[in-house]
Swiss-Prot record:
Its main location: plastid. Keywords: Chloroplast, Plastid, Ribonucleoprotein, Ribosomal protein. It holds the Pfam family Ribosomal_L33. GO terms for cellular component: chloroplast; ribonucleoprotein complex; ribosome. The lineage of its organism: Eukaryota, Viridiplantae, Streptophyta, Embryophyta, Tracheophyta. Transmembrane segments: none annotated. It comes from the Eukaryota. PANTHER family: 50S RIBOSOMAL PROTEIN L33, CHLOROPLASTIC (PTHR43168), LARGE RIBOSOMAL SUBUNIT PROTEIN BL33C (PTHR43168:SF2). Belongs to the bacterial ribosomal protein bL33 family. GO terms for biological process: translation. One of its GO terms (molecular function) is structural constituent of ribosome. Gene3D superfamilies: Ribosomal protein L33 (2.20.28.120). This is Large ribosomal subunit protein bL33c.
Length: 66
């Protein structure tokens, strides 16, 4: 029996301050985390505070498209 669309999907979180600083070339890279979310409970984009090793501080990481 084939399953339909999976409820718990894999999402990628990317540092928002590294993305903004990318235009100025102040950052050496961008921080990304891979996590899961339940699409029924949180249909909107996920935003979490995570540690960014490039900014050396806790920043907001937002969900990006695959």
């Amino acid at each position: 029996m084939a399953k339909g669309k999976d409820v718990r999907g894999i999402v990628i979180l990317q540092c928002t301050s590294c993305v903004r600083n990318d235009f100025n070339k102040e950052s050496r890279g961008t921080s990304r985390y891979i996590t899961q979310k339940n699409r029924h409970n949180t249909p909107s984009r996920l935003e979490l505070r995570k540690f960014c090793p490039y900014c050396y501080k806790h920043t907001i990481h937002g969900e990006i498209k695959k």
